[in-house]
């Protein structure tokens, strides 16, 4: 039968075996099978009384009920800690479920995402409160800041023979928290110094996170004394995974946090930020922000994936109101004070510059198109790409300006090769004649906008190819299009990163039609599922392509 593997001498009295199987199946209907199996075994083993069987079944029922209640509490706690991030929370729930069924050894999470979106809050007010002892006390939480750190002694101390030496932060946490299994949150791991000393820090962290070694961690101050940190829970927090040592990154269970949507920011403003601001200013129920005002502040005065700048701005506005109330005791106020967009622009922020968003042109132009960019901080937008002929001694010499880095430069050369091979032979002959003529005008200068900002990566390869094709063939590019995608020598358009950031930022610039790689279909589907009801996507068109020829048909005006 289904439980025949449990029907062995010595196991019959151990309800825990059935409980383990029961939990593993996660199906409450299986309890009937458990009861039938107990009855069957009881018939074969007359030494078992009905009372003993009922007691074991009650234990199973009770244990399963406690687990169900606990997992429900876990979800509630995580939701209360931060708004949104459902995928990240689900991964944490899965790991906690694994701890219930399996071993409860230490673990290492990697919280990956832009700043200000709730990574620390989810760890401190969420995960910490989910992990409680039998007295209901939350697992102790400690934080270590690694941004710019260049000294390994921060973590594992100095040798005690040095004057003024002391132990490292890991031992200090154990001393402060009085336990060997705290939650240790190590922030800004991607900002660790790139020097040799920085490599030492990476080596220490790699040792700390290795389950085969972290049961014998040694602090230099306590030489020869092993510290068992195998039960500790480590959380590394970082913005850009590409800046982290690959061996260290391989040690962590990566959990990606997405940028907050406009709706997310609205909810967080009303449920978390404003109540906190009002409380600190002593102005509860005395000020009111409508949704339209909050949207205006978010769109016009912040350019971020999270809510740090938004929180700072709301503190500033409420602080101004508080100051006004304190200075004008004789003035009568109609509470709650309703903040308007006019108040923001003409009173509180009359000297503050709004975020400047460069709009895409209205006219179709030759040798000009809209690329797209995304940063590790979760921002994105359009990247204007210009190409013009210039006098040159070399036919089709490329002059690359705008602080382009190595990968982007290589992409430019590939784009030129592809664009040249797409150009009709008659047009090639015309260009050669121009080069041989007295004008001597056939070098090409390619310049992406914002010349003071470094740019790198292959994702602009596709749009650069179209810009060069436009220039070589004297054909304008549709102004309201934007494209992202890496170009291959074959003309294939391949996957890129940060698609959602690129689209959201480009919408602000006035882009109406988007071209993206077919290989990014999953990324686009995730994006569209989240934003399909957003007003900003009304009348916006999206096209997926896997070859540059498809993009040419869409974007080149003929």
Regions found by a protein language model. Give the residues of each.
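Conserved C-terminal "switch" segment of AAA+ ATPases
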Residues: 64, 133-136, 178, 240-250, ...
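Pre-Walker A (pre-P-loop) alpha-helix and adjacent loop at the N terminus of AAA/AAA+ ATPase modules
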Residues: 68-112, 419-420
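Walker A/P-loop
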Residues: 108-145
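AAA+/P-loop NTPase substrate/partner-engagement loops
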Residues: 131-165
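AAA+/SF3 P-loop NTPase mechanochemical coupling elements
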Residues: 177-181, 217-237, 287-289, 440
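Conserved catalytic/switch belt of AAA+ P-loop NTPases
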Residues: 190-226
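C-terminal helical "lid" subdomain and adjoining coupling/linker elements of P-loop NTPases
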Residues: 279-286, 299-374, 455
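Peripheral, non-AAA+ core regions of ATP-driven protein-machinery
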Residues: 336, 358-370, 378-558
């Amino acid at each position: 039968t289904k439980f025949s593997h449990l029907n062995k001498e010595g196991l019959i009295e151990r309800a825990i075996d059935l409980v383990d199987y029961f939990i593993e199946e996660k199906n409450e209907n299986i309890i009937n099978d458990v009861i039938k199996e107990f009855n069957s075994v009881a018939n074969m083993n007359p030494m078992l009384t009905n009372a003993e069987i009922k007691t074991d079944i009650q234990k199973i029922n009770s244990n399963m009920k406690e687990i169900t209640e606990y997992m429900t509490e876990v979800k509630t706690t995580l939701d209360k800690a931060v708004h949104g991030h459902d995928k990240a929370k689900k991964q944490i729930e899965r790991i906690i479920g694994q701890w219930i069924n399996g071993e409860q050894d230490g673990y290492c999470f990697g919280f990956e995402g832009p700043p200000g979106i709730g990574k620390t809050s989810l760890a401190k007010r969420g995960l910490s409160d989910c992990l409680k002892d039998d007295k209901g006390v939350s697992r102790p939480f400690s934080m270590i800041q690694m941004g710019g750190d260049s000294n390994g002694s921060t973590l594992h101390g100095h040798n005690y023979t040095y004057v003024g030496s002391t132990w490292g932060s890991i031992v200090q946490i154990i001393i402060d928290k009085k336990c060997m299994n705290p939650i240790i949150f190590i922030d800004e791991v991607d900002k660790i110094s790139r020097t040799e000393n920085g490599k030492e820090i990476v080596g220490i962290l790699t040792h700390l996170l290795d389950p085969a070694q972290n049961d014998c961690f040694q602090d230099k101050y306590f030489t020869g004394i092993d510290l068992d940190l195998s039960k500790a829970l480590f959380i590394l927090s970082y913005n850009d995974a590409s800046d982290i040592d690959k061996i260290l990154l391989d040690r962590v269970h990566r959990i990606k946090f997405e940028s907050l949507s406009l709706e997310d920011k609205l909810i967080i403003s009303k449920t978390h930020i404003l109540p906190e601001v009002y409380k600190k200013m002593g102005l509860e129920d005395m000020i009111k922000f409508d949704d339209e005002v909050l949207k205006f502040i978010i769109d016009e005065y912040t350019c971020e994936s999270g809510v740090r700048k938004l929180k700072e701005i709301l503190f500033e506005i409420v602080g101004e109101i508080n100051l006004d109330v304190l200075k004008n005791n004789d003035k009568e106020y109609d509470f709650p004070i309703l903040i308007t967009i006019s108040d923001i622009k003409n009173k509180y922020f009359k000297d503050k510059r709004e975020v400047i968003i460069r709009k895409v042109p209205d006219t179709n132009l030759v040798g000009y198109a809209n690329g797209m960019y995304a940063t590790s901080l979760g921002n994105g937008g359009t990247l204007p790409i210009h190409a013009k002929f210039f006098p040159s001694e070399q036919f089709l010499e490329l002059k690359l300006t705008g602080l382009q880095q190595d990968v982007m430069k290589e992409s430019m050369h590939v784009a030129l090769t592809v664009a040249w091979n797409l150009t009709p032979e008659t047009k090639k002959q015309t260009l050669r004649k121009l080069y041989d003529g007295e004008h001597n005008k056939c070098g090409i200068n390619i310049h992406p906008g914002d010349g003071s900002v470094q740019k790198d990566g292959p994702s602009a390869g596709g749009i650069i190819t179209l810009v060069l094709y436009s220039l070589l063939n004297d054909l304008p590019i549709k102004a309201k299009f934007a494209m992202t995608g890496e170009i291959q020598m074959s003309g294939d358009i391949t996957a890129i990163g940060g698609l959602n950031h690129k689209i959201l930022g480009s919408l602000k610039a006035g882009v109406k039609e988007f071209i993206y790689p077919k290989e990014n279909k999953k990324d686009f589907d995730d994006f569209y599922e989240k934003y399909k009801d957003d007003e900003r996507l009304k009348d916006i068109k999206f096209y997926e392509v896997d070859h540059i020829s498809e993009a040419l048909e869409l974007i080149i005006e003929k």
